Structure formats: C-alpha cells, structure tokens
C-alpha cells in the first residue's frame, strides 16, 4: 500500500472514483508513511489518524453507494497549523495557543471537507507563521526532506516536507512574503500563492488581508490547482473574498 503515497493527488482521485482503490487503503498508506518517516523530520505535529480512519470509512461507503463525490473525495490532506480545525489542536506554533482546540473549522478548511478531503494531520509552522524557517517552541523544528539537519524553509515548511516525502498527497499553506513559495522551492514541491481574496482568510486582521493569503501545495501543479479549486470561495468573514 505504501506505493499509493507516491502517486499524484489527481491520479489518486481518479483511482478512487473508478473504485480501483479505497479511501481506507489510501489513508492507511499515508499513516504508515508518516509513522515511518516523520520521526526524523517533524512535519506532521498533530496527527489525526483516528479521525482520518473514520472519515475514510465514510468516504468508501459513499463510493460504493454511488453517491456524488467531491473534488477531493477520499484524499488525505494536511492542514497548516495556522488554520482552525474543529475539535483538532490548532496552536499557530505559539505557546500561547498550545492547548487551543477550535469549536469549528474556518472557511477554507470547511470547503476542503465539503469536497471530500480528509484531514490527516496538522503541519508545522513558525510562531504565527512569521519566519522563513519552520520551528517553534511548541513542537520544535522541521527538517529538510533531503537533509534533515538543514532548514526546509517557511513558513509552510511542515506541509512542504510532508508532501515531498509522500506523507500525504495534498496540504494547505499560507503566504505573506514567500511562505508558500519558499518551502516549496526548498523541498521540491509546488506552492501556489493565489491573488488576495481567492481563498477566504477569515480571522486575519483587515490590514493584512490584501497581503497574507491562504493557498494550496502539492507535488505537481495540477495537484495544487485541484486543492485550490476546493479552497476557494466567498466568506462573509473576509471582506476581500
């Protein structure tokens, strides 16, 4: 099953739609890869394996029942630890939020779930996403996938490393001055910085909204675009969306 981890997100989505693979198989494959790879890298700081297994079983049933399937149906996805996730620890990389568990998903995460994406874990970020590296006092540093003792860039470094090592096919990120693009370059993956307002950034100070954006990451351009299509949308809490 571990070979599934190395396929592109678009290929995996097609395989799920054709019933060639099960979302359960895919999630278990990603969990196995995380457990065997991440000890040396520290990319997935809050795994959500039980949650992912439950959602994978529901996704499998939907496929077998012939239900309409979303863009991301059955795909495991990492969420940067700046984005609020219902019932899942969201620290923002800060000791101030070390025990913070939001009651609801923010809009970008809700959109991913609505398209069938399965949250498999939260990925590391510097405190409040401020930095061209990925380290904080809550979880420590994330290593480069090619040389763990070196930097992976930032601030979406946890997502970039998880993608580069096949821990998951898709992951979210954010970008103010390079936080999607820098770690993508350091890790050999793709990060797309959308125009402001394409992906609603609920909860950000209004003064930052024209500059700080949420966006997708993948191992290929078409994968990142697939995630972007799910993330995007209007949100009343973001006046720029």
Residue ranges and their predicted role:
Residues 50-60, 116-117:
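Long amphipathic alpha-helix in the N-terminal Rossmann-like dinucleotide-binding domain
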Residues 1-54:
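An N-terminal boundary/leader segment
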Residues 104-231:
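Short glycine/serine-rich loop segments
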Residues 12-18, 97-101, 212-219:
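Short, well-ordered beta-strand elements within core beta-sheets of diverse protein domains
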Residues 71-108:
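Enzymes and membrane/adaptor proteins characterized by extended Gly/Ser/Thr/Asp/Glu-rich
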Residues 59-76, 223:
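Immediate post-signal peptide segment of exported/extracytoplasmic ligand-binding proteins
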Residues 30, 52, 74, 80, ...:
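Conserved hydrophobic/aromatic pocket- or pore-lining residues that grip, position, or stack substrates
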